[in-house]
């Protein structure tokens, strides 16, 4: 069930924070070409057993931009504490679909969504639903790191202060420290919490954004190409973090990297021209796909 959080308009009063920023609220496999398919080393990247508790579900979801249909009636169930990867060629609708899961498409005037999206069996498109609360419960990490123009501490503390999650400054300090620990960043920044978050490296900034998301106690974390702007070392740290976070959160990640999907996800969903073509365990999708379109994509024949 969704927790009660006090909401205010204080974010809107801070003109130094952009509108997009306000929407926030390991062991590697060798995944490479081998013949026609991507090899999938289950020994080096064991996948956890995903419990069949449905956290998010969509039913006949369509998304329109004006008269153009971007998502064509998708049904999908996302399980609690799983990592599910959305893959597909550019323009296939995977990011658009991801944004329906916490109503980020509401910010686009020409966008219209039909169908049902349920979080713990509650319709998130119910007109009486508090969207600010929803976006705290279903957090978003964007493609480009977008720290607030504030200190490292204030970046993480901003959400808890906004939502009234800390009783006093000691509570707030504990939330900030715990969130930075969970994001794998505490040891790197604990002695410079008052320095600007924008002064961190790209990989550190992305982990700071993840800490900021964690700080408001989400149940689901959506990630839209979170590593596309990062170097390989920073990418490896974020991927390891995803694995650790999945013990506490449900994670959906959009990625153009099939190798990344193979490394981090329990299940993979393949999108093509607004349709959900196939969803199955990541191992099966990459080694024995059911659909010819999936096979063509993962073997590099298009996309």
Swiss-Prot record:
Membrane topology qualifier: Peripheral membrane protein
Reactions performed catalytically: phosphate(out) + ATP + H2O = ADP + 2 phosphate(in) + H(+)
Species: Acinetobacter baylyi (strain ATCC 33305 / BD413 / ADP1)
Summary of the function given for this chain in its UniProt record: Part of the ABC transporter complex PstSACB involved in phosphate import. Responsible for energy coupling to the transport system.
Domain ABC transporter: residue ranges: 56-298
Pfam family, one: ABC_tran
Protein name per UniProt: Phosphate import ATP-binding protein PstB
Ranges in a coiled coil: none
Locations listed in the record: Cell inner membrane
BP-aspect Gene Ontology terms: phosphate ion transmembrane transport
Tree of life domain: Bacteria
